[in-house]
């Protein structure tokens, strides 16, 4: 049985809406864009509903519909939305599963293929809507020229739709054949299998993509859509027939009217089985969404009549009826699309909630690790006399603009609320500089631990919302005095966190500028060239050179000179001697000489503080932020711990002055704590030592005596002991909870202990127990915890 013939050309208007003059002109002059859009848009919802019906009929594999929608950036939005919508339609189904097998791809491809189709339709719809709403003077042909560029854009979008349509069509045929395979009647099965031939479609896509005439291209895409619509109708008819003929499936029934005239839903319609019907209890139910779709389609093709038997002629009739239903000029198509949308949106509450891309939740174990890390970090900061500071999570947009160079595009702008243009903070350094300027502060050593936000592409270990731990010193000091302390703080942080072998790459902004001047880079291009050099930790020099030459306008000769110099790296004092030796080009550059003199002081101080062993003098380090003016540095892990930069900072003498007439020099470092969390979490998991709580004692009442529990646990709290209590008659539940929570001690109190005036202390790690007087147990425990 072949699919029904394509219906006649569609018209615009949807729910009876009038055509705009531009639409009339477009249609009267053979521009098929409106017809394509009008035909394709409703098929987005219809295709999902039909795919869900086929999943039911063929017992499809729906494992692929568990598409991740978290903030990891690993899934496309439309793909995830299709998967979620089909899952909502199938909610409650006892037919679908994860059967797998050779034909599983016919169902597992649904989210991807339907998602791409949805994306292409939306792009075309947006463009067509703009063009059709443009003002047009009818009757004056020259006045309605859309312009060659606009026509090419429409053709390009329509052509982009052709491939998804072709993929949808082939997938629809494949699913329909899987449904046919479920039919027991061999003769009917053969007729249906042999009836679909799509050989005539093989050249369709090629013709669409090579046609040079715009109208021919658009008509080709439109014809593909008509063919897809017919195939989709045939698939729906086959799926309905398979469900109808399968006696193991509980058939949904429409609502019935009671004597009062109100409608009551038949329990079958929602997948529920009537009580007492033993036979029906054995039948499998459809999903609640697919049940509703099936009832609507069945009512259309049968006019409410009972289906006594299914044959090829009846299927042909159903296919024709459904093809007409899927035609945009059919009034009932609106009802079908609205019904599918209603099912999905009504069941929205059943969707698993999700978080935005690039964000994460911290569970109890992660919070324990985070608090431990913060306590170490805060301890180091306070040891150096720093005070805590907090600033707003959003700033005036003008405060942040012009401070981050090319990274300014990553700033999150907020909607205007009350006349102020605001943005989420990109880092903690600029807000600190603004605070110093606003409050006319001349000297301050501060730390801040807070979240920052960047509109970056999320990936593994890279977030849009993340913590930074900042330590900054503002004020006028002796040369390299605060720079030394900030770098020393960084080494202490990484040593105490004990998360791997690291090195701190260090350079000087004036030395970097001198290097670029020596190589022949124009001063106005220093910053943009630095942003390219800054990528050398992720890209080869050949890739960076291509960017310098092709995008930044640097000559090949200049780029090669830069490449020779940025290779210089090694132990600080050795590289310093190399750069200052006789004949060095750096010694002929005033800025470079100043930088090298400052670095000599810094390196000698770090050497005396036993911290220079972690430092690498690296001329390829070029922090991309515009506000750095002196020493710059970046901490990275060595060896197998590949998480990129974990800390960075430098001197920024002019940043405070951007907010006031007074310049206050400053230097600081920022620790990217998210990557530290990941390493610490992995270490704790390997040791199996992650504890969400710090509870030391569990008071276990073998019974339900809350009064006794309150008395005992309060004594422990008053003694400064971290304790919890639990009421249950089963001793195993107490032991299980204490073991899973990592609680080292238990106070066991049962009937015998109550009558004897004693309690039982249990050391879980040593598997030892002892009885002590009820009046002394708190002090005994305090002593044992103090001296384990």
Curated annotation (Swiss-Prot):
InterPro entries: aa-tRNA-synth_II, aa-tRNA-synth_II/BPL/LPL, Anticodon-bd, Anticodon-bd_dom_sf, Aromatic_Lyase, His-tRNA-ligase, HisRS-like_core, HisRS_anticodon. It catalyses: tRNA(His) + L-histidine + ATP = L-histidyl-tRNA(His) + AMP + diphosphate + H(+). Residues 252-286 are annotated as: Disordered. The keyword Metal-binding does not apply. Its EC number is 6.1.1.21. GO terms for molecular function: ATP binding; histidine-tRNA ligase activity; RNA binding. GO terms for cellular component: cytosol; mitochondrion. One of its GO terms (biological process) is mitochondrial translation. Transmembrane segments: none annotated. Homodimer. Belongs to the class-II aminoacyl-tRNA synthetase family. HAMAP family: His_tRNA_synth. This is Histidine--tRNA ligase, cytoplasmic. It comes from Oryza sativa subsp. japonica (Rice). The lineage of its organism: Eukaryota, Viridiplantae, Streptophyta, Embryophyta, Tracheophyta.
